[in-house]
Amino acid sequence: MDVKSVSARNLGRTSFRHFDFVMAAFVAIILLSNVIGAGKVAQIWLPGVGYWPFGAGILFFPISYIIGDVLTEVYGYARARRVIWAGTVAVLFMAFMSFVVVALPPAPDWKNQAAYEVIFGQVPRIVFASVCAFWAGEFVNSYVIARMKLWTGGKALWTRTIGSTIAGQAVDSLIFYPLAFWGAQGWTNELVIQVLVTQWALKVGWEVLLTPLTYLVVGFLKRAEGVDVFDEGTDFTPFRAEL
């Protein structure tokens, strides 16, 4: 299918073939990263440095940020904004239901309550930090992509994907780790800073390495949808859901 450049303000409520699938994948990855990876610190051996700690949630980053980049690059800021809000609501609902289920009295013969609480008993501080960091980081990422696309005339996609990751992940990490772990038991201030910097650097590195894959996915979706959306005249406030 031929690809035509379209201003976002002329799209209205245009229906896209693959948007729903991209949205569902994005929300699913965000939920998995919060359930499985957010609270664990792993370590990696670096030559000349030794063992260096990093957050296990980094394993989900390659998928989540490719999808995040695709949403804005292919479908425009307004649709990406709706997906970010959907992800935010999904994380809040997951956290609420985790609290409810953990608080339910266990059956007398069920001996796994303590282990269950370790896995799903998220402390309010971590939930608050996670939601704030996700929301702010994703909107910065989307905004930078949309703005840079206008500045570059849609050329040099790699500058947008890498530039938006540098900015968005800086905001995400600077919000999440201090809010979640500064002064927490088992977390020294040095460890918080190490994990924060490592997460940011690894995510930027992932984005650089995966740039060819991002090009393939973006190219496929633009051809499948037949449009290349530019956010001319877009209202970039995050506090609205209209297209």
Role assignments for model-derived ranges:
Residues 9-25:
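N-terminal membrane topogenic signal
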Residues 27-43:
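Alpha-helical transmembrane segments of multi-pass membrane proteins
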Residues 37, 41, 94-102, 137, ...:
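Alpha-helical transmembrane segments and their lipid-water interface positions
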Residues 59-70:
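Central hydrophobic cores of alpha-helical transmembrane segments in multi-pass inner-membrane proteins
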Residues 91-109, 130, 134-138, 169:
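Transmembrane alpha-helix/helix-exit interface in multi-pass inner-membrane proteins
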Residues 100-125:
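Membrane-interface interhelical connector segments
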Residues 151-170:
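Internal alpha-helical transmembrane segments of multi-pass membrane proteins
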Residues 217-243:
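Short, highly charged, low-complexity non-transmembrane loops/tails of multi-pass membrane proteins
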